[in-house]
From Swiss-Prot:
EC number: 4.2.1.2
Catalytic reaction annotation: (S)-malate = fumarate + H2O
Organism: Nitrosomonas europaea (strain ATCC 19718 / CIP 103999 / KCTC 2705 / NBRC 14298)
Gene it is expressed from: fumC
Name this protein carries in UniProt: Fumarate hydratase class II
Gene Ontology cellular-component terms listed: cytoplasm
Length: 462
């Protein structure tokens, strides 16, 4: 059997591996863009297959595509959606900025596979054409941004939101469990007035609640699809009903309420929806850094750090220091969140690079967007399972810090004034006295008054 076969495109003949389902344009891209090896995300490939399936169905319903050809394309697309033929999509991210080569990769694979389904031979005697049939009424310029939005919505809905909700649930349960544990607060990394450990954790829960709400608010723009705009947004060479119908079919297939974009010129030339949505991902990264950093600081020690919470001992922490346990889940979350922030810069630049009727940074934008959603989802899930769920309070250390804190003196402000309270704190600090001892020696309060006025539990009441 020959190792290669000849495939043809508008430029000429190309040698393609005999076993491959792809065709000439995919092979040209492989030959011309051997850059880094980072392939198009599988989520985008899945979304493209969904687009082609929907388009074939709608074009048939509109009387524009033969029933047998439409059925064959739909069957081939269903195979891709089921995870088959994954090796037939080898193109890298760093290619044409419109994603044309990946669109044609999908067109060629589905055309060759559909031809086989109709009894043809792979790459020969083509019964289904990649452009005339699979890409009918479409352009890479409207197909690729449509797939970008589908992939983004599915990544957010299917992976990111559930992972964040699970972490939020765990932190909420910890907040409730720690509601009666009074501890010292910290501002500017210095001792402050008390709060409960539950109140501290409630802040993390509220951050995630707001982050999830921001995610929801970013979805409506992502639910608008460019398909039907074709080359520049005018809808040239497509049926007047195609855009509306294909959006409805994509909504039916995906289970998400996609609609056709009201203005296709914006949908092709700009990616503001993804820039905005990734701004939310950046915010979520900041939220996770805040939570992860607090956890590792609160767990620092065991003898010489803050040590007010205990985290699970998942693995040895050092190759040289025996018995060391490091906050590895927090470190992983901080790293991945920093990567998301870097991705945000790339997406902002990519989103700004729309020239006239087309943005030509599409692969960059969706590659980074999907990496960010995956990192945040995986990171939240890992942190939840291997760290947050196992957090416990070190009540002995918490009580020690509370008793030693000079900031409890704040409770005396309403009774003796700020200046005298500050004098008590300074005397206690410099002479190594307790606050109570310093207050009595200065003659500002009696022992009985101090015990009534300086009550850490009452100081935490909102």
């Amino acid at each position: 059997m020959d190792q290669y076969r000849e495939e043809h495109d508008a430029i000429g003949t190309v040698q393609v591996p005999a076993s491959a389902l792809w065709g000439a344009q995919t092979q040209r891209s492989l030959n011309n863009f051997n850059i880094s090896g980072e392939r198009m995300p599988s989520a985008l490939i899945h979304a493209l297959a969904l687009v082609k399936r929907a388009a074939a169905s709608v074009n048939h319903d509109l009387g524009l595509l033969d029933e047998n050809i439409a059925r064959a394309i739909i069957t081939a697309a269903d195979e891709v959606l089921a995870g088959e033929h994954a090796g037939e999509f080898p193109l890298v991210v760093w290619q044409t900025g419109s994603g044309t080569q990946t669109n044609m990769n999908m067109n060629e694979v589905l055309a060759n596979r559909a031809s086989e389904i109709l009894g043809g031979t792979r790459g020969k005697g083509r019964k289904v054409h990649p452009n005339d049939h699979v890409n009918k009424g479409q352009s890479s310029n409207d197909v690729f941004p449509t797939a970008m939005h589908i992939a983004a919505v599915e990544a957010i809905r299917n992976r990111l939101i559930p992972a964040l909700e699970a972490l939020r649930k765990t932190l909420s349960s910890k907040s409730a469990a720690f509601s009666d544990i009074v501890k010292i607060g910290r501002t500017h990394l210095q001792d402050a007035t008390p709060l409960t450990l539950g109140q501290e954790f409630s802040g993390y829960v509220s951050q995630l609640d707001h982050g999830l709400a921001h995610l929801e608010s970013a979805l409506p723009h992502l639910l608008e699809l460019a398909l039907g705009g074709t080359a520049v947004g005018t809808g040239l060479n497509t049926h007047p009903e195609f855009a509306r119908r294909v959006a409805a079919e994509i909504a039916r297939l995906s289970g998400y309420p996609f609609i056709t974009a009201a203005n296709k010129f914006e949908a092709l030339a700009a990616h503001d929806a993804l820039v905005h949505a990734h701004g939310v991902l950046k915010t979520l990264a900041a939220i996770l850094i805040k939570i992860a950093n607090d956890v590792r600081w609160l767990a620092s020690g065991p003898r010489c750090g803050i040590g007010e919470i205990l985290i699970p001992e998942n693995e040895p922490g050092s190759s040289i220091m025996p018995g060391k346990v490091n906050p590895t889940q927090s470190e992983a979350v901080v790293m991945l969140a920093c990567q998301v922030m870097g991705n945000d810069v790339a997406i902002n630049l990519g989103g700004a690079m729309g020239n006239f009727e087309l943005n030509t940074m599409k692969p960059l934008i969706i590659h980074n967007f999907l990496q960010s959603t995956r990192l945040l989802a995986d990171g939240a899930e890992s942190f939840n399972t291997h760290c947050a769920a196992g957090i416990t309070a070190n009540t002995v250390r918490i009580k020690q810090h509370l008793q030693e804190s000079l900031m409890l003196v704040t409770a005396l402000n309403p009774h003796i004034g700020y200046d005298k309270a500050a004098e008590i704190a300074k005397k206690a600090h410099h002479e190594m006295l307790t606050l109570k001892e310093a207050a009595i020696r200065l003659g500002y309060v009696t022992a009985e008054q101090f015990d009534v006025w300086v009550d850490p539990q009452k100081m935490t009441e909102v």
